[in-house]
């Protein structure tokens, strides 16, 4: 035995692994029969224009695309600034404007 803990005689390369099955030698790496590869091509109808390059957009993850996120953040900024302007002009908070009493705590009897 050699001094290394993993001797090369213990492990064989995958290409040399084989088994005998019903008198035949089968390779473990490629135990499926190879099927012939058939290519079927069709001509495009007249007037169909083939794009020169495929678009390089990535598929959206649950609807979160870059463009949707940009528009969402812009709408949020407009709404937030609009809320600040309304509160500044009317000198009341948004909750006070819709009739919710604030500043009284939870008003729970203990």
Curated annotation (Swiss-Prot):
Q: Which residues lie on this side of the membrane: Lumenal?
A: 96-110
Which keywords are on file for this protein? Chlorophyll, Chloroplast, Chromophore, Membrane, Photosynthesis, Photosystem II, Plastid, Thylakoid, Transit peptide, Transmembrane, Transmembrane helix
Q: Where in the cell is it found?
A: Plastid, Chloroplast thylakoid membrane
Q: What induces it?
A: Induced by exposure to high light. Expression follows circadian diurnal fluctuations with highest levels before and shortly after the light phase.
Tell me the Gene Ontology biological-process terms attached to this UniProt entry.
circadian rhythm; photosystem II assembly; response to high light intensity
Q: Cite the residue span of the transit peptide.
A: 1-41
Tissues with expression: Mostly expressed in cotyledons and shoot apices.
Key word Transmembrane helix present: yes
Please give the superkingdom of this protein's source.
Eukaryota
Q: Name one GO cellular component term.
A: plasma membrane
Cited SUPFAM superfamilies: Chlorophyll a-b binding protein
The record describes the protein's role as: May play a photoprotective role in the thylakoid membrane in response to light stress. Involved in photosystems I (PSI) and II (PSII) core proteins function. Forms a trimeric complex with OHP2 and HCF244 that is required to promote PSII core subunit assembly. The trimeric complex forms a transient PSII reaction center-like complex with PsbA, PsbD, PsbE, PsbF and PsbI subunits in thylakoids for early assembly of PSII as well as PSII repair. The trimeric complex is required for the recruitment of ribosomes to the psbA mRNA during PSII biogenesis and repair.
Give the family, as the similarity comment puts it: Belongs to the ELIP/psbS family.
Q: What is this protein called?
A: Light-harvesting complex-like protein OHP1, chloroplastic
